[in-house]
């Protein structure tokens, strides 16, 4: 492992605490850890001095405008297709995420294989928690995709500035 940064430590602790809270919903320590981590990540303390990418949130908000889904539901449904789309543009960060958060062993693997294994670990974890895994579960239809893409606020500064066609591609993979 490289030295863990604050965001990686938060993710690792969130994984541990959420698994504990799912097994024991009244575990105060696990639930308070989840809230503490959310506070630190949402107030962007862990992002200071780094380039951040909030585009997945913009896509999620646009999906929410077309459905009754909460923001968390939209994020769980679109995150993996979004990250897989971005993987070539942020390969080293995704590789680091795989190794430092999911303990993926990179030996004998390409950077792409290591990064994808990390996303596969994330996918298994999300399924383990029972999260929404696609936007169809939220009531999204093919006919809604152009409107959702039109309603997505495109931000600068992430791994890739998305085009309308990029957003449509991500949404289709999220179905």
Predicted regions and their residues:
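Single conserved hydrophobic/aromatic residue that forms the stacking wall/gate
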Residues: 1-6, 10-11
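C-terminal charged capping/lid subdomain of soluble metabolic enzymes
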Residues: 101, 105-175
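Short, solvent-exposed positions on alpha-helices
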Residues: 28-32, 73, 133, 143
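Oxyanion-binding "anion nests"
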Residues: 14-52, 59
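C-terminal catalytic subdomain
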Residues: 51-117, 123
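Short amphipathic alpha-helical interaction patches enriched in hydrophobic/aromatic residues
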Residues: 18-22, 42-46, 63, 67, ...
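Generic structural concept
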Residues: 15, 35-38, 60, 80, ...
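Non-catalytic, well-ordered alpha-helical scaffold segments
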Residues: 8, 32, 73-80, 168
């Amino acid at each position: 492992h490289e030295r863990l940064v604050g965001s990686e430590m938060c993710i690792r602790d969130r994984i541990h605490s959420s698994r504990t809270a799912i097994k024991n919903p009244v575990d105060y320590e696990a639930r308070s850890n989840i809230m503490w981590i959310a506070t630190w990540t949402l107030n962007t303390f862990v992002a200071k001095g780094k380039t951040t990418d909030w585009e997945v949130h913009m896509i999620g908000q646009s999906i929410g405008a077309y459905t009754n889904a909460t923001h968390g539901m939209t994020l769980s449904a679109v995150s993996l297709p979004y990250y897989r789309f971005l993987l070539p543009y942020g390969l080293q960060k995704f590789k680091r995420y795989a190794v430092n958060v999911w303990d993926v062993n990179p030996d004998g693997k390409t950077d792409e294989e290591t990064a994808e294994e990390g996303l596969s670990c994330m996918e298994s974890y999300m399924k383990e928690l029972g999260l929404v895994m696609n936007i169809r579960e939220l009531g999204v239809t093919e006919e809604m995709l152009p409107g959702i893409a039109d309603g997505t606020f495109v931000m600068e500064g992430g791994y890739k500035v998305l085009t309308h066609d990029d957003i449509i591609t991500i949404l289709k993979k999220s179905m």
